[in-house]
Regions:
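Compact beta-sheet-dominated domain cores in extracellular/mature segments
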Residues: 1-179
Protein backbone atom coordinates (compact mmCIF):
# COMPACT_ATOMS: atom_id res chain seq x y z
CA UNK A 1 0.00 0.00 0.00
CA UNK A 2 1.41 3.34 -1.03
CA UNK A 3 0.79 6.34 1.18
CA UNK A 4 1.12 9.73 -0.42
CA UNK A 5 1.51 12.86 1.54
CA UNK A 6 -0.74 15.54 0.25
CA UNK A 7 0.81 18.98 0.30
CA UNK A 8 -1.51 21.91 0.18
CA UNK A 9 0.09 24.60 -1.96
CA UNK A 10 0.40 28.03 -0.45
CA UNK A 11 -2.09 30.38 -2.02
CA UNK A 12 -0.44 32.92 -4.24
CA UNK A 13 -0.20 35.90 -1.97
CA UNK A 14 0.63 38.61 -4.45
CA UNK A 15 1.93 41.71 -2.78
CA UNK A 16 3.93 44.67 -3.91
CA UNK A 17 7.06 46.14 -2.40
CA UNK A 18 9.20 49.20 -2.96
CA UNK A 19 12.67 49.81 -1.60
CA UNK A 20 15.62 52.08 -2.28
CA UNK A 21 19.21 50.97 -2.82
CA UNK A 22 22.12 53.12 -3.99
CA UNK A 23 19.80 55.99 -4.88
CA UNK A 24 17.49 53.89 -7.06
CA UNK A 25 13.91 52.91 -6.29
CA UNK A 26 12.95 49.29 -6.92
CA UNK A 27 9.30 48.22 -7.14
CA UNK A 28 7.92 44.78 -7.82
CA UNK A 29 5.08 42.46 -7.10
CA UNK A 30 6.19 39.44 -5.12
CA UNK A 31 5.03 35.98 -4.16
CA UNK A 32 5.79 33.86 -1.12
CA UNK A 33 6.75 30.25 -1.79
CA UNK A 34 5.81 27.30 0.42
CA UNK A 35 9.09 27.64 2.33
CA UNK A 36 8.35 31.36 2.99
CA UNK A 37 10.92 32.52 0.46
CA UNK A 38 10.12 35.67 -1.47
CA UNK A 39 10.13 35.63 -5.26
CA UNK A 40 10.01 39.02 -6.98
CA UNK A 41 8.22 39.18 -10.33
CA UNK A 42 10.60 41.83 -11.66
CA UNK A 43 13.92 40.10 -12.51
CA UNK A 44 16.04 43.20 -11.76
CA UNK A 45 14.46 43.50 -8.32
CA UNK A 46 15.00 39.76 -7.73
CA UNK A 47 18.69 40.07 -8.67
CA UNK A 48 19.14 43.12 -6.41
CA UNK A 49 17.36 41.39 -3.51
CA UNK A 50 19.62 38.34 -3.89
CA UNK A 51 22.68 40.61 -3.80
CA UNK A 52 21.40 42.35 -0.66
CA UNK A 53 20.68 39.00 0.97
CA UNK A 54 24.36 38.03 0.62
CA UNK A 55 25.63 41.12 2.49
CA UNK A 56 26.36 40.17 6.13
CA UNK A 57 26.68 43.83 7.25
CA UNK A 58 23.71 45.24 5.37
CA UNK A 59 21.88 48.16 6.98
CA UNK A 60 18.09 48.20 6.57
CA UNK A 61 16.68 51.66 7.31
CA UNK A 62 12.97 52.11 8.03
CA UNK A 63 11.72 55.70 7.73
CA UNK A 64 8.06 56.67 7.34
CA UNK A 65 7.18 53.42 5.59
CA UNK A 66 10.13 53.60 3.20
CA UNK A 67 12.84 50.93 3.28
CA UNK A 68 16.34 51.92 2.21
CA UNK A 69 19.30 49.54 2.13
CA UNK A 70 22.93 50.53 2.70
CA UNK A 71 25.97 48.33 2.11
CA UNK A 72 27.44 49.13 5.54
CA UNK A 73 27.01 51.32 8.59
CA UNK A 74 29.54 53.92 7.45
CA UNK A 75 27.53 54.52 4.28
CA UNK A 76 24.35 54.79 6.34
CA UNK A 77 25.87 57.26 8.82
CA UNK A 78 26.95 59.59 5.99
CA UNK A 79 23.41 59.66 4.65
CA UNK A 80 21.70 60.09 8.00
CA UNK A 81 23.96 62.95 9.18
CA UNK A 82 23.20 62.37 12.86
CA UNK A 83 25.71 64.87 14.17
CA UNK A 84 23.57 68.02 14.35
CA UNK A 85 23.10 69.68 17.74
CA UNK A 86 19.35 69.11 17.74
CA UNK A 87 19.75 65.43 16.94
CA UNK A 88 22.43 64.91 19.59
CA UNK A 89 20.26 66.57 22.22
CA UNK A 90 17.18 64.53 21.37
CA UNK A 91 19.19 61.31 21.22
CA UNK A 92 20.38 61.88 24.77
CA UNK A 93 16.80 62.39 25.96
CA UNK A 94 15.24 59.31 24.40
CA UNK A 95 14.05 55.96 25.65
CA UNK A 96 12.94 52.71 24.12
CA UNK A 97 10.70 50.01 25.50
CA UNK A 98 11.21 46.52 24.07
CA UNK A 99 8.64 43.73 24.40
CA UNK A 100 9.06 39.97 24.16
CA UNK A 101 5.72 39.57 22.38
CA UNK A 102 4.10 41.29 19.43
CA UNK A 103 1.76 44.25 19.84
CA UNK A 104 3.64 45.54 22.91
CA UNK A 105 2.84 42.55 25.10
CA UNK A 106 4.84 40.28 27.37
CA UNK A 107 7.91 41.09 29.42
CA UNK A 108 9.38 44.49 28.72
CA UNK A 109 12.74 46.21 28.94
CA UNK A 110 12.82 50.00 29.16
CA UNK A 111 16.18 51.63 28.49
CA UNK A 112 17.49 55.11 27.88
CA UNK A 113 19.61 56.28 24.99
CA UNK A 114 22.99 54.62 24.94
CA UNK A 115 24.99 51.66 23.72
CA UNK A 116 24.01 48.13 24.70
CA UNK A 117 26.46 45.61 23.21
CA UNK A 118 24.76 42.46 24.53
CA UNK A 119 21.17 42.10 25.68
CA UNK A 120 21.76 38.69 27.25
CA UNK A 121 22.44 40.32 30.64
CA UNK A 122 18.91 41.81 30.45
CA UNK A 123 17.37 38.45 29.47
CA UNK A 124 16.34 40.00 26.15
CA UNK A 125 18.72 38.18 23.81
CA UNK A 126 16.96 37.10 20.60
CA UNK A 127 13.45 37.61 21.91
CA UNK A 128 12.29 41.15 21.08
CA UNK A 129 9.13 41.14 19.01
CA UNK A 130 8.01 44.76 19.21
CA UNK A 131 9.18 48.09 20.53
CA UNK A 132 8.29 51.74 21.04
CA UNK A 133 10.72 54.64 21.20
CA UNK A 134 10.28 58.31 21.99
CA UNK A 135 12.03 61.42 23.16
CA UNK A 136 11.72 62.23 26.84
CA UNK A 137 12.96 65.81 26.90
CA UNK A 138 10.31 68.54 27.17
CA UNK A 139 12.46 70.67 24.87
CA UNK A 140 12.23 68.13 22.05
CA UNK A 141 8.81 66.47 22.38
CA UNK A 142 8.37 65.83 18.66
CA UNK A 143 11.99 65.22 17.66
CA UNK A 144 12.67 62.02 15.81
CA UNK A 145 14.68 59.26 17.46
CA UNK A 146 17.00 56.85 15.66
CA UNK A 147 17.17 53.32 17.05
CA UNK A 148 19.63 50.78 15.68
CA UNK A 149 19.15 47.07 16.23
CA UNK A 150 21.94 44.60 15.51
CA UNK A 151 21.66 40.94 14.55
CA UNK A 152 24.69 39.92 16.63
CA UNK A 153 26.17 40.99 19.93
CA UNK A 154 28.84 43.69 20.08
CA UNK A 155 27.19 45.57 17.20
CA UNK A 156 27.88 42.82 14.70
CA UNK A 157 26.01 41.47 11.72
CA UNK A 158 23.17 43.19 9.98
CA UNK A 159 21.79 46.47 11.27
CA UNK A 160 18.14 47.50 11.37
CA UNK A 161 17.74 51.25 11.84
CA UNK A 162 14.50 53.10 12.53
CA UNK A 163 13.89 56.83 12.38
CA UNK A 164 10.96 57.19 14.72
CA UNK A 165 8.52 60.02 15.15
CA UNK A 166 5.42 57.82 15.39
CA UNK A 167 6.00 54.09 15.53
CA UNK A 168 3.80 51.02 15.53
CA UNK A 169 6.36 48.28 16.31
CA UNK A 170 8.24 45.67 14.32
CA UNK A 171 8.87 41.97 14.66
CA UNK A 172 12.63 41.57 14.48
CA UNK A 173 14.96 39.23 16.34
CA UNK A 174 17.90 41.22 17.71
CA UNK A 175 20.75 40.88 20.14
CA UNK A 176 22.24 44.36 20.58
CA UNK A 177 21.08 47.96 20.50
CA UNK A 178 22.60 51.37 19.99
CA UNK A 179 20.45 54.46 19.97
Amino acid sequence: MEVRQQVTPLKNLVRSTTFNYQGKNYTSELNYTNDSSIVYIDKEVQKTAEKLDQNPILVTFFNAGIITYYDNESEFDKTLNINTKATRASRLAAEATFYKDTNYNGAELKIGAGNYPDLNSYSFDNCISSFKASTTSPGFPTSAVTVRLYADKNYGGRTYAFLIAYFDGRNIVIKTIIS
